[in-house]
């Protein structure tokens, strides 16, 4: 699974580099931003 650094676009099949899931201001909307 690819990881996205904080602040970059994060897709359903990606996770943040810290091992957390993608977070965004909109729920269930992709792509979203990796905030954590």
UniProtKB/Swiss-Prot annotation:
GO terms for molecular function: calcium channel regulator activity; ion channel inhibitor activity; toxin activity. It comes from the Eukaryota. Coiled coil: none annotated. Expressed by the venom gland. Transmembrane segments: none annotated. One of its GO terms (cellular component) is extracellular region. Disulfide bonds join 3-17, 10-22, 16-34. It is found in: Secreted. Keywords: Calcium channel impairing toxin, Disulfide bond, Ion channel impairing toxin, Knottin, Neurotoxin, Secreted, Toxin, Voltage-gated calcium channel impairing toxin. Neurotoxin. Causes spastic paralysis and death in mice. Moderate inhibitor of L-type calcium channels (Cav1/CACNA1). Belongs to the neurotoxin 10 (Hwtx-1) family. 53 (PNTx27C4) subfamily. The presence of a 'disulfide through disulfide knot' structurally defines this protein as a knottin. This is U4-ctenitoxin-Pr1a. It comes from Phoneutria reidyi.
């Amino acid at each position: 699974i690819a990881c996205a650094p904080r602040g970059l676009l994060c897709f359903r099949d990606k996770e943040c580099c810290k091992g957390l899931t993608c977070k965004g201001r909109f729920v269930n909307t992709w792509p979203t931003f990796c905030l954590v």
